[in-house]
Amino acid sequence: MRNIKVAGYGTYIPENFVKFGNQIRHRVVKEDNITQIDMAVEAINKALENAKLEIENIDCIVSTSAVCAQLIPCTAALIHEKIAKGTNIPAMDINTTCTSFISALDIMSYLIEAGRYKRVLIVASEKASIGLNKNQKESYELFADGACAIIFEKSNDKKKGVIYSLQQTWSEGAHSTEIRGGGTLKPSMIFDQEHVSDYLFDMKGKEVLLLAARKLPKFFKTLFKESGLGISDIDMVIPHQASRALELIMKKLGIPKEKYIDIVQDYGNMVSVSVPFTFCKALEAGKVKEGDTIILTGTAAGLTANAVILKI
């Protein structure tokens, strides 16, 4: 076990929202002049206040945003500029798109356990609405904006921490969810209106769902076998709020309704923010509490699946 615990957390959700039927999506509007970095800073300040800490008490800042604020430098450096300028706290990005937060928790738990860092700030911030294609109704009505920051630190309680983690990628799904433009394959300098869709989010939802449905049962079978646990040992599953198909996937995995959190209707898919935000909402509502064993899990573009079993 990697002995870590939550020291504090904070979230930020834009006040503005749009409705698609009974589905609510919080999105930044141009008039608000709120950047992805601004949202991250709001969440971080709340997390520091919640933990009763100052930024100087943080040993590492990790940004897990799926989409960067700018290509260079890393988003974590831009966040550092706003909250830690004048310090030499290391800052880095960890990116597996929607499951970036889980990947970061997994990686940083090893570094905390090894003594490299005592306390790590992991922040996810997404302005997904800016890159949506209005012609793709499914994804246009699904995604939302927001930010979440959680501070993890070394735990002296040997019963708390990461019990087991697993990540797998099936690259046959690499082009089922993508933004093709903006990198070296299709740089922004060759942008033209004829190919504008290359620079907007493109998701083939049915392909993703079918691939996930084929791969996830075996993924979870491995997770439980290697960890020595079963669903009866888990108090709550905190899944990525991928889509309204969440209930179908959970049912296929044999996870009963009372053992997972579903807030898709109220918040939609906030990309890398979804998992930590759902975790924080569960903590606030008392749906998970100290001593519980939980699973943070989700799928991401790639197709990647991620899971961390955590004793909180």
Question: Each predicted region: which residue ranges?
Answer:
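Phosphate/pyrophosphate-binding loops at sites that engage ATP/ADP/AMP, CoA/4′-phosphopantetheine
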Residues: 43-59, 218-235, 282, 286-287
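Conserved catalytic cysteine-centered active-site region
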Residues: 27-35, 65-120, 251-279
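Buried hydrophobic positions in well-ordered alpha/beta secondary-structure cores of metabolic enzymes
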Residues: 6-8, 47, 61, 104, ...
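Acidic, glycine-rich active-site loops and adjacent beta-strand->loop/helix elements
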Residues: 64-69, 96-99, 124-129, 168-170, ...
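Catalytic phosphate/nucleotide-handling subdomain of diverse soluble enzymes
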Residues: 277-297, 303, 307-312
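A structural motif shared across PLP-dependent enzymes of the aminotransferase-like
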Residues: 14-20, 38, 67-78, 242-245
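Flexible, glycine-rich active-site loops centered on histidine and acidic residues
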Residues: 113-147
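Condensing-enzyme catalytic core mediating Claisen C-C bond formation in acyl metabolism
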Residues: 1-34, 136-210, 218, 312
